[in-house]
Amino acid sequence: MLDVSVPKDSFKLIKNLGEKYPSLKTLFEEIDSNLNQNLWYQLSENLISISNKPELPNSKDLIQLYNGLVLFIEPTLNPMKYLEFVQNMLHNYKDKMEEALVFVENIERKNAQKYKGEEKIFIKIIKGFCFLELNKMYELEEVVKNTEQDFSGNIEIDSSLYSQYYKLSTLYYEKKEDYDNFYNNAFQYLAYETKYQTKIN
């Protein structure tokens, strides 16, 4: 089992966020409890739930939660759950997408040897959404084409990743006004998103 050191300030942050968001207080209390008991799987699920709440993307609190907690426990988390939290956290950057891109590229560089298969594809897709927001069409095109090649060589890929990819490629082709590919990818996105939602419900 990995040994991680969580500073006392992390627990203070969790308590403060629970007080700031009364409707989420129970969830923050679960985070505190699971953290104290080293229940990493449950904790990763808690963090995803928090990052999906509509209250937090409109603030800087996900960034604060990342810097004050997630950064310390990242080695214990499932890499895909960690990346899902990172993707949701990027909503906090809003008009600072250049900073978000640098942040994501640093994660990619740090984990170059660790990320294989799904993780490698997911971080590439997250970068693609940054390129989309920054209107960096050449870089986005590279992500779309390279990720499509990645899929062709892998049959064991979760439907959620296909959903993410086809959402990205649909938005890419819409920007290019390539409507044939736009509609083809949009249909694929809807199919995989429906499959993913059915799986988790």
Language-model features: where?
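Extended alpha-helical scaffold regions
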Residues: 1-201
